[in-house]
Amino acid sequence: MIVTPTSVKGLIEIKSTITKNAIEQLLIQSNSDVSKELPIDTKFNLLGTKSTISPKTVCKHIMEIYKDGDIVRGLGVIYSLDWKDIIIFDTRNDEYIAHVLNNFDYGVSSFVNNLLFQIYGSEVYLSIANQIGPSLFIPKERYKIR
């Protein structure tokens, strides 16, 4: 089956270990020439089973890399199964923000919930949330990337 670039809603990269190098690779992919053919709202997501860096370090590293560079396609969610927090990226009022939220041991379900929101929109997300119960996230840190 052939998938046209315009039908891609998001990409998920799965790594055994989230490292600074894995973050750099994700950013290179999201800013590649191929990414320019994807819809503007396409998000790049990263899921790892473990990590060598903290969510705070991930955000600071992304800020360093994007300090002088262009952002072609945004990031969606970065999560490692050994973290207590989840990183969710948001664009509002011409700002590109990384939110570090307390995940409350929801584990990978928080990652999947955010993907559902990205891909299917708020109606599907809220429909599922109403059936399984609300998710509670407490913001811990906020990083303005741009």
Which residues does each PLM region occupy?
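Intrinsically disordered, low-complexity Ser/Thr/Pro/Gly-rich regulatory segments
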Residues: 1-146
